Amino acid sequence: MLSQAILLWLFGSIHISSQFFLESPSNLSTIAGESITFRCSAEKSPEPIVYSQWKSNTGSLLGYHQEGILPGHQGRFSYIKQNAEELHLKITHVNLDDDGEYECQMLHPEEGPIRAKSFLNIIVPPQLVYFSNYQPNSIIAVKENTPLNITCVVPNVKPEPEVLWYMDGKVMSRDVKQASTPHLNKTFTVYTSLVVQSDRNDHGKVITCEAFQKETDIRITTNTTLDVLFPPSDPTVEILRNPSALRSGDNVTIACSVTGGNPPPDVFWYHENKRLQSHSTLDTRSKEIKNIYSFIASQNDNMAEYECRANNSRTGNPKRKAMKLEVNYPPASVELFGESNIRYGSSANIQCKSLPSNPASQITWIINGRSVPTPTQREFVVENGIVSSSNVSVHSNELSVEAHQINVECMATNPEGSSAKQHVIKIIAPPKAPIITGLEDRKFFEGDIVNVTCEAQGGNPLAELSWYRGSEKHLVKGRKKMKWSQVKKKLVMSLLCLCEVVIMNFFRFSKNVFYFFRFTLFIECGVNGAHNEVAGFSSYSTLALRVDRTMNTQRLKCEATNAALDEPLIESQYLSVYYPPRRVLIRPADSGDQRLLVGKSARLVCGTLSSNPAAHISWQFSRATDDNKVHLGDVSLNETTRDNGFNVENVLSFTPTEEYDGTVVHCIANHPEWKHSVNTSFPLNVMYPPKMLVNDPVTVVMSEGDSFKENLTVRGNPAISLWQWRKNGVPFDHTIGRVFARGAVLSGKQLLSTDAGVYTLTATNSVGSTNITIKLAVEYSARITSISTPVIAATGDTVLLECEADGEPSKANMIHWYKNGEILAAQHRGHKKAILRLNATEQQSGEYTCKADNGIGVPAEGQTFLLVNSAPRVLPVARYAKTAGILGGVAKARCKVYAVPTVEFVWEKDEQLIKKNSSKYSIVNTQIDYSTYESTLWIKNIVPDDYTKKVKCIARNSFGTDHLSIPIIPPTHPDEPFNLTMTNSTLNTISVAWEPRFDGGSDQIFEVKYRRQNDDLIHLVNTTHTNLRLSGLATANTYFFQIRSINARGFASSWTSPVIFATLNEDGVNVAMIRNEKLKLTTWIPYILIFIVLFMLLNVVICCFVCNRTKKRKLREKTEMARTAINGGDVRQVQMYGTMMGNDGMSRRDIDDRPEMSEDEHSVRTMIEVSPNGYMQPIEPMLYESTGLLEYDYQTRSYMGSSQGTRSMTYANVPYPEPPQPSYHSNWNSLQRQSNNNTSPQHHLSTFINPNMGVRAGPINYAQLDGDLV
C-alpha cells in the first residue's frame, strides 16, 4: 500500500519534458473503425526506467502493465513494449469515444517523472446527403417567378464538410446559407439552404447538393429536378379552307392554336357554352397545341358563335377566343293565316309569313292561278336569320269562283332557293231541314238498342248533324272537327252533366231539392254512338241508341248546322221506356233505433227507386218453418220521379223471436211488363239476452293430475260484454288454483283435489244476463293419512294397528290390512279408517301393510311393524355362507340376524373371543330395519392358519342366542346365481332379476347370456347389479336366458340352466305362455324315445356285465390256485394306504374280491403326492392361487376295472416294474387334466404300496398285478 502511494505521488509530480524522450507521441487523425498506435520511448540510461504508463482521453490512468491487452475498453487498448525505455499504446477499432487527449508518463531514474501529450482526432466521413423536404431524384413543381427554398442536410459528420450547390453543373453561390448543429458524440449535422427564383427557361434543370470532406476526400451528392409551371399563350382561331361565303350544307373546319404552357394546356371548342367533341394535337418542335373541329353548316349556324378555350393548372381562368359564322340558306317554308270560309259577297284577309332565311326572302302572291301585285312587305330579324311578311285582301264578288272556293298561293324566294304554300277559301251555303227515321214504335224496354237515322240535304259545306235528348240538350257527338270555342263549350257541358248525375244520386230522397236543380240547370251532355257520313249532296247521321230509363218521355232531337246557318235546323221524336228499379232497399221503419228486440213489434220498409210502371212488392222469410210463404205488406208510398217513373215503399210488420236472429228477409219487386224481377235481402239482427245451450248444472268429474276443458257455448245478441266467474260463491279473475276461465271456457291443467268445487258463470250483454253452474269433482287415489307406528309387544299381548286414508271418491271397505300378501280381517270405522286387532305371537310378528284403494290410480300403501319379543335367529343368506381372501389380504365375514329387541353381536375363533378393532380384526354392526341386524367381521393379514379354522358369529339378546360358523377359504370361483326370474316384459323389452351367491372372495359381476329361439346369435351383457333391462328385442319372440358370476380374480361360475322368457305380442299377451301350452306334448316325445333307447341299452349292458364277471371269476380262481401251489398255499398280502375322494359319478367299487376301504378313503382334508423319489408328502392346495398341482412325467396306463374309468390319474415316475398290459384299452384319455376355472371336482388319487414293487398310484385290480398266470 505504501509503495502504491509513493508511485501515485511521483506520477502526480510529473512534469512535461520532451528533451528526455527519444520518441515523443504525436497527434493522430484517423477514421472511425481503424487502428492507431501512440509511440513513446525515452533515451537510454544506465539505470532502467522504473515505471511507465498512459493516461486516456477520459483522464483515467491505464496503469502499469507489461506488454499485452489492457483490461477494460472492450479489449481494444494494448501496450507494446520491446524494452524498458519504451511504452507504445495501440487502440484498435477506434470510435468517437476515443477522441481526445492522451498522455505518456514515465519515471526516469535521473530526471524523475516525465510526460508527453498527444491528441487523437476521430474523423467521421459523410454517409448521407438529402433534401429535408424532398425525396432524392424527385421533381419539384414550382410556379414561374415564385421563390423556392431548398434545404440540404449532411448528418453526423466530423469535421464539418464543405457543401456546394449546382444547377445543370454550374456552381450557385448566391442566396446560399449554411449552419450546423453539434451532437454529444462530437459530430455535426450541417444544414445548407438555397433560394431559387425560377422562370420558364429553368424548366427541367437539375439542382445538385454536394458535400465534400477534405480530410477524407469524400464527395457525396443528391439531385432534384425543377418543374416550372407557366401559362400558355393566347389562342388564335381561323376557318380552314375559308370559302368566299358559307352556305347551308357546306363542310366547315375551324382551328384553334395555343403555344407553350406547362403543364400542356387543354384546348377545346365550345358552342352555346357546351363543349364540342374534338381532339387536340401537339407539335413537339414548336410546342404548339392545335384543336380542329369540323361540322356541316346549317341554318342554325348563321350568326352562331364558336369559342376556343385554353386552360392549364397555372392559368386560373381559361383564355378565350370566339368567332361568329354567317351562313346563307333559303326559307324552309311559308305560313298562311286567314279565314277558310266566307259567305258569297264578303271578303277575307290573308297573311303570308316566311320562315327565317339569309339573305331576306321576297314574297309573291298567286290567286286562282294568276299573279297579283305584291303589297308592301315587312322584314324582321330573328336569332338565325330574317323573316319576311306580307298581307293581301281577297273579295269573293271580284273573282271568278269555281266549286265554291278560292285558291290563294304565297311564295318566298331568296338567292339560295324558294318555298310556297296554298290556302283554300270556301264559299258557304245553308242545307235543308233534317228528317228522323227509325222511331215509329214509341215503346221500348230499358237496354234495347234502337237504330235512328237523321238526313239533311244540300248546303256548302254539307250539314253537320248532332243528336240531343230530353228537355235538356244531350248532344250525341258527331265526327267533324270543332273549333276551340266549341271544344270549350263541350267540356263545360260534360262537366255539368257529371254534376247532374252526382246530384241525382245525392238527392234521390229529397225530391224538392232535386227538382229545383232540375229546372235551374240546362245541360248539354255528349253521348257516344253517332256515325256520320256523306252521300252525294246529303249528310246522314246514324245512331245506335241503347235505351235507358233517363230517356223515358224524353224527346230525341236531330240538329243540322253548317257555317251558313246562324241557328240550327231541328227535327225531334218522343220515347217511352219500361224499366225495373235498379235496386231495392230494406230498412227499419224507425230510423232512430235500428235494433230489433225479442217480443217487441218491428216494422221493415222496402222501397224501390224509379221504375216504370210502378212495382208490385212482396216479402219472404228464409226460415224452414215458413215454407217460402209470401207476405204482401202495406203500401205506404207511390210517387212519380223526375224520369216519369215511380217510387214505391211497402211496410211489413211482425214480432221477432230468438229464431228470427240471423234470418234473411227477402223483398221482391216485379211487374208483368218487366223482363225480370228485382229483389234484395236483409239479415235480421234480433237482440236477445244470453242463453246457455247446455243444461244447468253441468257436472265434470276428473282425476287428480288430469286436464280438462269445458266450453259452455253461450249464445246471445249482441255479443257477451261481461263474463263473471265465481268458485263456491267467491269471485275470481281468470285463474284460481289450477283452473283457468277464459270467457265461456273453463279449463284445468294437472288438477289437484283442492280445485274441486262449484263454479258459477254469469254472462251479460246489453239486453240481459244469465247464470250457469259447473260442479267440478276431482277424483284422486286413496292416500294414507295416518298409520300406527311400529309396536313392540310380548307374546300374548293384544295389539291394535290403525290406518286412516282419504280419497275421492270415498268407498266402503277401501282400506285393508295385509301381511305377506294375504288380506287380514279388520274392523272399519266409516270409509276412512280400519283397525286390525292382533294377538302378539312370534308368528304374528313382522311387517304389516295397509292398502287404500278407491279405484282411482295406484293403491296407496303404508307399512308398520309388529315386533314380538324373540330370541335372535340367524337368517340363511347364501352369499354369507363362507368368506375368502388371499394370503396377506383381507376377508369379510357377515351374518344377518332377526331379533326383537336389539341384538348384541359377538365373534369367536377357536372358542376365543375376537376383540373389536384390533390390528387383526374389525367389527361393524348395522341395523337394517326394526328387527333385522347385520354384523360384519373384517379379517386382515390372512395367514395359512386362518384357512384351517372357522369364525363364529354369535347373536344374543335377553330372550336367547343363535350363532353361525363361517369358514375362511382361499380365493376361488364364485357360486352361480340362482332364482333367475322375469320381472317385466313389453313389446320389445324384457326385465330380469336374480339372487347372487358366494362371490369367491372378490367383487363379482354378472354376465347374462341370451339368444332368440331358432337363432344361433348369442348376446352377452355384463352388469354389477342384480337386475337388468334389455331393450331392442323383437316383438312376440321367445328368448333363452342364462347367467353366471365372474369375480375380480377372473374366476367364473358355471352357467345356470336356460330359462325361457318372451316379449309381448301386439295384443299384450306373453307368447312364451302360449307356446309352452303348445309344446307340452311335443316336449315329452323326445324324452320318451330316449328312455326307450336307454332301457334297451341297459339290458344289453347287464347281459355283457354278467357274462364278463363270470369269465373273470373263473380266471381269478384259476390264478389263486396257481399262487397257492407256488407259494406253499399262502396268498401274498397287499396293503392299501392313501386317500380317495369319493365320486359316485366317475367310479364304482367292485362288489366282489375287493378289500374294504380304510377310513382314509373318506377324508377330504389331505391329498398325497408321490415325489420322483418315491416319498409321499401332504399338499395344501388352498394356500396357493394355482389351479392345479405340479405334474410329474408319467406314462398313460389304462387298467381294467369296472365299467367306469378313473378320471385324472397321475403316476409317479419311479424305477419300478410296470404292471402288465391290460387285455383291452379304454377310449378315455383319463390323464388329461381339465381346466374349467377351477370348477371341476377334485381329482381322485389313490396310493398302493407293494413290498416288492414299491409305491404305485391308481386303483387296484388283482387280475392285473402279475399278469395272466394261467
Swiss-Prot record:
Region described as Disordered: 1231-1250
Domain Ig-like: 20-120, 126-221, 235-324, 331-426, 431-576, 581-685, 782-866, 872-965
GO biological process: cell-cell adhesion; cell-cell signaling; collateral sprouting; protein localization to synapse; synapse assembly; synapse organization; synaptic target recognition
Topological domains, Extracellular: 20-1084
GO molecular function: cell adhesion molecule binding; protein homodimerization activity
Record function comment: Cell adhesion protein. Determines synapse formation. Required for correct localization of syg-1 at synaptic sites.
Carbohydrate-modified residues: 27, 149, 185, 223, 251, 311, 391
Transmembrane segments: 1085-1105
UniProt topological domain (Cytoplasmic) ranges: 1106-1270
Pfam families membership: C2-set_2, C2-set_3, fn3, I-set, Ig_3, V-set
SUPFAM superfamilies: Fibronectin type III, Immunoglobulin
Membrane-protein topology: Single-pass type I membrane protein
Subunit note: Interacts with syg-1.
Record InterPro entries: BTN3A2-like_Ig-C, CD80_C2-set, Cell_adhesion_signaling, FN3_dom, FN3_sf, Ig-like_dom, Ig-like_dom_sf, Ig-like_fold
Keywords: Cell adhesion, Cell membrane, Disulfide bond, Glycoprotein, Immunoglobulin domain, Membrane, Neurogenesis, Repeat, Signal, Synapse, Transmembrane, Transmembrane helix
Disulfide bonding pattern of the chain: 40-104, 152-209, 256-308, 352-410, 454-558, 606-667, 803-850, 895-953
Cellular compartments annotated: Cell membrane; Synapse
UniProt signal peptide: 1-19
Tissue specificity field: Expressed in vulval epithelial cells.
Taxonomic lineage from the root: Eukaryota, Metazoa, Ecdysozoa, Nematoda, Chromadorea
Domain notes: The first five extracellular Ig-like domains are required for correct localization of syg-1. The cytoplasmic domain is necessary for syg-2 subcellular localization.
Annotated ranges, domain Fibronectin type-III: 976-1066
This protein's name: Synaptogenesis protein syg-2
